[in-house]
């Protein structure tokens, strides 16, 4: 969401009928959007750690912006380096960035769980926000 320009950027993967329809939308077409829904985030963390994988990184970008430049750390994972096109966007917002890829093409080889225990051990975070594949969310919740 860019309030100054009055624009909304959507990031999605074409999987089902709805995203196929969305892929056919052209610049200038009108869309109806409902939201935000839910309860939002507790923004009181002083040292937030954002943990995301795959398309789960999209909503965390908006959250990082909400915390302000340099406040959050990001631990991001993807299948390959190509899936981590987000790095430039997050570099502008986060004080530290930790990367993992399943194939080891960038960052640490493995999932975000490869780095999470060390980040917890080192401290430096007072709240963890996670979005992404269910196995990652489950692993973070039990770490």
Labelled PLM ranges:
Residues 17-143:
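FNR/FR-type flavoprotein reductase catalytic core
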Residues 1-27:
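Ferredoxin-reductase
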